Amino acid sequence: MTEEFNESMINDIKEGDKVTGEVQEIEEKQVIVAVNGAKFNGIIPISQLSTHHIDNPSDAVKVGDEIGAYVTKVEYDEENETGAYILSKRQLETEKSYEFLQEQLDNNQTIEAKVTEVVKGGLVVDVGQRGFVPASLISTDFIEDFSDFEGQVLKLKVEELDPANNRVILSRKAVEALENAEKKDELLESLNEGDVIEGKVARLTNFGAFVDIGGVDGLVHVSELSHEHVKSPEDVVSIGETVNVKIKSVDKDSERISLSIKDTLPSPFESIKGEFNEGDVIEGTVVRLANFGAFVEIKPGVQGLVHISEISHSHIGSPSEALEPGQVVSVKVLGVDVENERISLSIKATLPNENVIESDSETTQSYLDNGSDDEDNPTLGDVFGDKLKDFKF
């Protein structure tokens, strides 16, 4: 009979089998389970009750719970015809966890997990077993102190699974990047030219300032920072500063947004009505050269154009032949259009024309008064003499 009993025992449940049963008794360091369809009870040591660290078996199970476990060892006492199955609930939980995580990895799904511990290299999380989020995969932004994450439930993506080495690597950064991309798409759709919105200066370059307007950076070109001439963006704004910006253009395909701070500020032209009039001669500073002329600042934020034809009495091919940025010049006001913020200026009109022939005013007037029919009256040759000799007609 003992032989028959042994054989049935061995053939009944073997090491590696998956079994189910009801928790019958909870002891200090183990749990007794009535294994379904088996001749002996199962024993689960406290170390095999959970994938998490527990101090008491009752932290993992309660009497009457129906649980599953793997058989890790079959113990049988032939002499007393008694036996027991050593079980691992932890092994089964780990297997199920890997199956779930592999499915999420294959389908690029997002999961949620609670941070159980903050360590030097990152975050330990509960994903049915121990998972790890390295510091480099915690956020798209730099974070110096991770302590605030302890106890938080995070959205994560599975980056790497290695069951053989009990290695589960997850990323919060990947989730953030995806969320940021979605927010960017939504924001780009909502932006309209002419809108005035609030943003924060994110970084400065020599050609302008990038402003964060809600997860997307737009560029304020250096020429759009102020009504006044700006040499360097850092002279006007600083990183972290909150500013109002006007949307000048949005290219949704290239995700480029052009912004202006200048357009949100009062125009200095509003304060010059009656200050500058046609014919006035004033001083200004050359701030910019173009192929068609030079822009001269005559008051902070107020620039006028000296057309290339108004720079010199002599022919010039380029404004740079006569002028350079920073040069102080005298200009004559040719016209003022405050409504359209345009001022026409002339440098030429303030300069003597060396090509104009100087004449004796009295002699010339005499010629004009008396005419040239009388032979006693002077001719043009008499008036100008040798002055006409070198002049080309």
UniProtKB/Swiss-Prot annotation:
Residues 356-381 are annotated as: Disordered. GO terms for biological process: translation. PROSITE patterns: S1 (PS50126). Transmembrane segments: none annotated. CDD domains: S1_RPS1_repeat_ec1_hs1, S1_RPS1_repeat_ec2_hs2, S1_RPS1_repeat_ec3. Residues 16-90, 108-173, 194-262, 279-348 form the S1 motif domain. One of its GO terms (cellular component) is ribosome. Residues 356-369 have a biased composition (Polar residues). Keywords: Repeat, Ribonucleoprotein, Ribosomal protein, RNA-binding. One of its GO terms (molecular function) is mRNA binding. Binds mRNA; thus facilitating recognition of the initiation point. It is needed to translate mRNA with a short Shine-Dalgarno (SD) purine-rich sequence. Belongs to the bacterial ribosomal protein bS1 family. This is Small ribosomal subunit protein bS1. It comes from Staphylococcus saprophyticus subsp. saprophyticus (strain ATCC 15305 / DSM 20229 / NCIMB 8711 / NCTC 7292 / S-41).
